């Protein structure tokens, strides 16, 4: 289905799985860069496979954040503004398309989640070795939990990021949300 933000101005394909037992909330996003299809496909498959009766807490999956560019096969930047969504967080409520999307995520989604996994892959033109970034510039507990999340991923490289704004997962970590960004190669 679709999930609406910003009073209905932003509509994204998503799935919310409410577990049988109460617990924390995990956000999983794909399509920050609309040409990174591996993360988008992983979100689609997760949304179809996860079962509420086997889930504790809530999982929110936003399958394609940069929906306009994805639907128009227009590359990974914002369709109307040419901006990289992963460089504009926390966003601006009166800004460009990507800045408004980042703002909606910052104000409407991040306050409701405890953990965040941002799925990426090599874009159309990239050839990447899989790796995972974890938040390294946040409160100590957030950094430690982010590192533990990253350690669960089977990739050859793990990188501690020292950035606290611009990217979705970095900004989320600066707001107290344990976060990782997974690059699955391309």
Give the predicted meaning of each segment.
Residues 1-186:
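Structured catalytic-domain cores with a bias toward divalent-metal coordination
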């Amino acid at each position: 289905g679709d999930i609406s933000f910003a009073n209905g101005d932003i509509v994204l394909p998503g799935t919310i799985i409410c577990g049988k037992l109460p617990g924390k909330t995990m956000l999983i996003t794909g399509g920050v860069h609309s040409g990174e299809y591996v993360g988008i496909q992983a979100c689609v498959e997760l949304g179809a496979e996860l079962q509420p009766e086997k889930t504790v807490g809530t999982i929110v999956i936003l399958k394609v954040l940069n929906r306009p560019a994805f639907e128009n096969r227009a590359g990974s930047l914002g369709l109307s503004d040419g901006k990289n969504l992963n460089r504009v967080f926390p966003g601006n409520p009166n800004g460009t398309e990507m800045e408004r999307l980042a703002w909606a995520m910052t104000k409407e989604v991040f306050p409701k989640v405890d953990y965040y996994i941002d799925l990426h892959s090599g874009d159309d033109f990239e050839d990447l070795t899989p790796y995972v970034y974890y938040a390294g510039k946040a409160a100590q507990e957030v950094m430690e939990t982010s590192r533990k999340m990253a350690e669960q991923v089977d990739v050859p490289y793990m990188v501690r990021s020292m950035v606290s704004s611009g990217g979705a997962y970095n900004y989320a970590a600066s707001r107290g949300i344990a976060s990782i960004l997974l690059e699955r190669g391309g």
